[in-house]
Each structure stands twice: as C-alpha cells, then as structure tokens.
C-alpha cells in the first residue's frame, strides 16, 4: 500500500484510499484519457480479481463551468484503488460517492458506478485551472506520470496556452490534445500560440476557426503529430504544409482550400517519398475532380468499397485508383462526395 508523505505530495484526499498502489505508466494511450497506468500490486491482485474480473477503470475530471473536461486512468484487468467501502464488499453493483476537500476553494466529488463490466469514477471540480494542475502534481508524484492527454473547449476567460505551458513545465509530455469549440474564432496570434504548444503531440484535434489570412510556418508544422492530426477549419493549410507531414500517420483536413492541382502535385511528391510514414489522408475539397488529380501519374483502376449504414457498397467507376511509391508501397486514391481519400496499403 502506498502512503505518500505530505512533504512530497500535494495535499489531496486520494492517498486516503487504502488500496492505492503505484506502478509504471503504461505507454499506450487512447484519446480523451489523461493518465494511463497499471495497478498490479501483489497484495491486491487476489482480492481485486475476485471482485472484478477483467474490469476497466476510468476516472474523469469535469470542470463543468468552463466546459473543460479531462479524464485520466483506464486500468485493464485488476482494479485496486476504488476505496474501502467498495473493495470491502462483493457485489454485482458498485455505487458510491466520496468528497475530498483539496483546499479552501477546491472540492472534488468522486462518484463510482459499476455496470457489470466497467467501473467508472467521475471527479467533479470547480472551474479553477489551478485545481487541475494540483491533481496533475499529485498524480505525477504518486504514479510518476510522464504523458498526459487533455481535452478542452476554448473559452475567452480561459487561457489554454498558459495551461498547456504549465503542464509541460512540470516535465509532462502532451501526448493527445483535443481542442473543441467549432464555432469559436481566434485571432491569428492566439491560434498560432496554441498550435506552437502542441507541435510535438502524438494526436491533435483543433476545432476553432482562425481569421482568414492566417499563415503558419511550414517548418513548425512538420513536427506535428506522429499519429493523428485533425483540423476542422483548415483553410490556411497549404499543400506545402501537407507534404511536410510525411511522418504523421493520419491527416484529416476539413474546410480546406486545397485544389485539384495542389493534390496532383502532392501525389507526385508522395510517390517520391521513400520511407514516409503517412498512411491516411482525408481532405474536404471543393469541386473535387479525381481525374485531374491523378493526371500524368502512373495509376491503375481499383475497385473501391466503402462501409456505411446500409453495409458495404462499391464506389462508382472512376472514383478509385491505385498508385505506387518508388519504394514499392501502394496507396488507394478515392473520392466520396467532396472528400479526397488516400489510404496506404
């Protein structure tokens, strides 16, 4: 059992839970999770397996007044930190509420639910950003957290850039960042600063709009994301930005201003990118003309199949082609409505 001292760990009621044990941070992350770690302490394995077989555990933090949400912790298999009143009983239905007071301004309410398969604990806190950082400090100390994923909605009263800087200044890597607020429009400087704080994330989703005329350095853009990049208002993304993402696995650009000619040039460049990691490209393109996009390239017609609500269906003739890179890697080029899709085999 872990019993952190008050001199090394911020004051927080979590350490009062009797079966809290520390282990290494699991590297694999899934979107919308803040911390992923494993609880495998020998002294709790037998008890937990008896109570919850193959159970996942998830804790979520919601700062409701700012529409800010961060979730942390999903444990596959055994669970060991649900608290005395939960772990001391064998029951098919586990519900409970705990309230911890962190300081004069911050209270944390934990609500436990067990639906027979998954036990979830939801943490509700006041809107102060500092409260989130206090929880981060605590869990970083207890679990030696190295990576975090965050999700938040842009708010004029909320300084997202300062929050992201504060997280990184704690020696924690921003792994997945989800920035919601589809109808929010940011000034160019604010949008740029936000992007700059997220350049080395594995996954990034940016929903807010930025004013027309916004420009962003291609050299900075090339560092974005090893896994997934999604930009909802991508009118500012040029074909040079797209080409620079050779090491990002999947790119989705909505409301883009890329043209058929741009994509023709991009495919020519991609066919020369030996060793590039880029696997999937999904672009919203106005007046999409696939024959113009593949004009002058070496291609073969391919039968395209897509899945939808009605099951699988074939794409119309001329809406799916196959191209090959110089290193032998093949990719399928297709269109669905106004969406251009490239999928590497």
UniProtKB/Swiss-Prot annotation:
* One Gene Ontology term from the biological process aspect of the record: embryo development ending in birth or egg hatching
Does the record bear Nucleotidyltransferase in its keywords? no
Give the classification, highest ranks.
Eukaryota, Metazoa, Ecdysozoa, Nematoda, Chromadorea
Gene of origin?
Answer: sdz-15
Pinpoint the F-box domain residues: 11-55
Q: Give the source species.
A: Caenorhabditis elegans
Keywords from the named record: Developmental protein
Transmembrane segments annotated in the record for this chain: none
In UniProt terms, what function does this protein have? May have a role in embryogenesis.
- Give yes or no: UniProt keyword Transmembrane: no
**Which InterPro entries does the record cross-reference, listed alphabetically?**
F-box-assoc_dom_typ2, F-box_dom
Q: Which Pfam families match?
A: FBA_2 (PF07735)
What is the name of the protein in this document?
Skn-1 dependent zygotic transcript 15 protein
